[in-house]
Regions:
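N-terminal alpha-helical interaction modules that lie
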Residues: 1-121, 129, 135, 142-156
Length: 156
């Protein structure tokens, strides 16, 4: 399942109280299997992330950057918007690093206490992926800049 599909399936299941795994699986089979699941966003963060999913599918760097800026207009703490701007608008590694660091800060604000509570397992949590992509982008960029020790610390 793609990340947008997983996101929309998660939205579909939000607030549901299943009495068993079998009941949950039956719900998923009925509502998701073989279907394109689309659930309207519950707030500005989800709306911005939906714009980011469109940007990730776009082939034009100009369109991707435009959609990233649109996502930031909707929700200024959209970490993936900064990640896309680092990829598409940064003219050098220094500028890319600034975008990734803005993404890290934005993602940390979104995650709040969850950032510390789930440290070490964040890649496994769907809502932490934009933050983790910003962290990975920062580390890769530092490595490319020859700042190896900083890059290693950023990875861990």
């Amino acid at each position: 399942m793609t990340e947008p599909g997983l996101d929309h399936t998660s939205r579909l299941m939000a607030g549901k109280k299943f009495s068993s795994a079998e009941e949950m699986n039956a719900f998923l089979r009925e509502n998701c299997v073989g279907k394109h699941v689309t659930v309207p966003p519950a707030g500005p963060l989800q709306a911005a992330q939906d714009v980011i999913y469109r940007a990730m599918d776009a082939h034009s760097p100009r369109v991707r950057a435009h959609l990233a800026r649109k996502a930031l207009d909707i929700f200024p703490d959209c970490a993936d918007a900064y990640n896309l701007l680092a990829e598409e608008e940064a003219e050098d590694d220094g500028e890319a690093l600034e975008f990734y660091r803005k993404g890290i800060e934005a993602g940390a604000r979104v995650l709040g206490a969850e950032l510390e509570e789930r440290r070490g397992e964040l890649w496994g949590h769907f809502n932490a992926r934009p933050y983790m992509r910003a962290r990975a982008g920062e580390a890769h960029t530092l490595w490319d800049m020859g700042r190896r020790e900083e890059a290693e610390r950023a990875y861990y």
